[in-house]
């Protein structure tokens, strides 16, 4: 029988060997499951930074867009067909911040999906639907701005609340039908049986897109983009012409009606410029991701995971950009924020407050 002195070195070697094997073996999302996905966790420092960056984006998307919606829906002065479109756009971005970004944050930082297969599909459907809805809203907003700038006096008759409601309904209906049908019918995975099998592990949420779906996504992005670029090019030319006319008229005596028309045109051009910046930010956020999706679909998903995560979060952060753009360019939005934050919005008749400095 071995003595304690003889057995101790053997036990020590066993412990060291076990620790070495543990260090060399890959970490799993679920340690007790054989089909668990492998995770590649960050060290504590980078993890904290990533959580802070991604979490800030989610909070900004929710709070910022909630402020936009509250401002437009509460203050009667902002009740216009164009602003209802903006409020609906803010709703889409807010839902991205609520239902998509927090869960994607955990997946991106931890390298695992801990929210189940059912919510994985729902999460992806939300992602596609709300982002598609944002694009369609921006497209309709660009058309609205074109009508407003090209003929500001006739605009209220042409773009009514009814027209705005139809645009909003179409944007949401088409986006939700497309996003959910693509995921829940399995159309996105058709022809990718081997890849789907390779990605099937517990703790993963990767739904690959085949070439057909990637091309459809790109076309859904491209067509509204071309519409917006064409429309904003025309808006720029009209605004330039109006500015020249106003400069000429400023040297002459004008009637009151002409002066009113000039003020309206100036206000509409400023709104078009602000929303044009929002459109440009959207396109710059989405274009790298879509190009990468096409490259992956046709070259065998060659993009490194960290590059993919960066591109995805650039897209997500776009949902937080619009409130910042409005706050920078719209004095009425800054005034509304002050009233909301200070609690003055709760006072009686606060909805009739004049938010415009002019």
Curated annotation (Swiss-Prot):
Residues 69-83, 144-166, 239-274, 334-358 are cytoplasmic. One of its GO terms (cellular component) is plasma membrane. GO terms for molecular function: trace-amine receptor activity. The chain crosses the membrane at residues 48-68, 84-104, 126-143, 167-187, 218-238, 275-295, 310-333. Glycans are attached at residues 34, 210. Keywords: Cell membrane, Disulfide bond, G-protein coupled receptor, Glycoprotein, Membrane, Receptor, Transducer, Transmembrane, Transmembrane helix. Its main location: membrane. SUPFAM superfamilies: Family A G protein-coupled receptor-like. One of its GO terms (biological process) is G protein-coupled receptor signaling pathway. It is a multi-pass membrane protein. Disulfide bonds join 37-201, 120-205. Residues 1-47, 105-125, 188-217, 296-309 are extracellular. Gene3D superfamilies: Rhodopsin 7-helix transmembrane proteins. It is found in: Cell membrane. Belongs to the G-protein coupled receptor 1 family. In addition to the well known disulfide bond common to G-protein coupled receptor 1 family, trace amine-associated receptors (TAARs) contain an unique disulfide bond (Cys-37-Cys-201) connecting the N-terminus to the extracellular Loop 2 (ECL2), which is required for agonist-induced receptor activation. Olfactory receptor specific for N,N-dimethylalkylamines trace amines. Trace amine compounds are enriched in animal body fluids and act on trace amine-associated receptors (TAARs) to elicit both intraspecific and interspecific innate behaviors. Ligand-binding causes a conformation change that triggers signaling via G(s)-class of G alpha proteins (GNAL or GNAS). This is Trace amine-associated receptor 7h. The gene is Taar7h.
């Amino acid at each position: 029988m071995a003595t304690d002195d003889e057995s101790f070195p053997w036990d020590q070697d066993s412990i060291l060997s076990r620790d070495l094997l543990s260090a060399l073996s890959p970490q799993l999302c679920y340690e007790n499951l054989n089909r668990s996905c492998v995770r590649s966790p960050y060290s504590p420092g980078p993890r904290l930074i990533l959580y802070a960056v991604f979490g800030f984006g989610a909070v900004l998307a929710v709070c910022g867009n909630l402020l936009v919606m509250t401002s437009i829906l509460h203050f009667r002065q902002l009740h216009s067909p164009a602003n209802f479109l903006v409020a609906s756009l803010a709703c889409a971005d807010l839902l991205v911040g609520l239902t998509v970004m927090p869960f994607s944050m955990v997946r991106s930082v931890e390298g695992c999906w801990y929210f189940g297969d059912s919510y994985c599909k729902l999460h992806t459907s939300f992602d596609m639907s709300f982002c598609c809805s944002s694009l369609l809203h921006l497209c309709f907003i660009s058309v609205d701005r074109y009508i407003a700038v090209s003929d500001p006096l006739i605009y209220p008759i042409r773009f009514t609340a009814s027209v705005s409601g139809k645009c909003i309904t179409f944007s949401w209906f088409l986006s939700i039908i497309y996003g959910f049908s693509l995921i829940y019918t399995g159309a996105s995975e058709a022809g990718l049986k081997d890849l789907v099998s390779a990605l099937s592990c517990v703790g993963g949420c990767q739904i690959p897109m085949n070439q057909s779906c990637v091309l459809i996504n790109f076309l859904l992005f491209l067509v509204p983009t071309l519409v917006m670029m064409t429309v904003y090019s025309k808006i720029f030319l009209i605004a330039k012409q109006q500015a020249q006319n106003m400069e000429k008229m400023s040297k002459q005596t004008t009637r009151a009606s002409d002066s009113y028309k000039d003020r309206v045109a100036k206000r509409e051009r400023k709104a078009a410029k602000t929303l044009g910046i929002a459109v440009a930010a959207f396109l710059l956020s989405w274009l790298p991701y879509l190009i990468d999706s096409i490259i992956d679909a046709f070259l065998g998903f060659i993009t490194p995971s960290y590059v993919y995560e960066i591109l995805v979060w650039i897209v997500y952060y776009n949902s937080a950009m619009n409130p910042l753009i409005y706050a920078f360019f719209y004095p009425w939005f800054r005034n509304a924020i002050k009233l909301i934050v200070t609690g003055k919005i709760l006072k009686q008749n606060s909805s009739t407050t004049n938010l415009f400095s002019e």
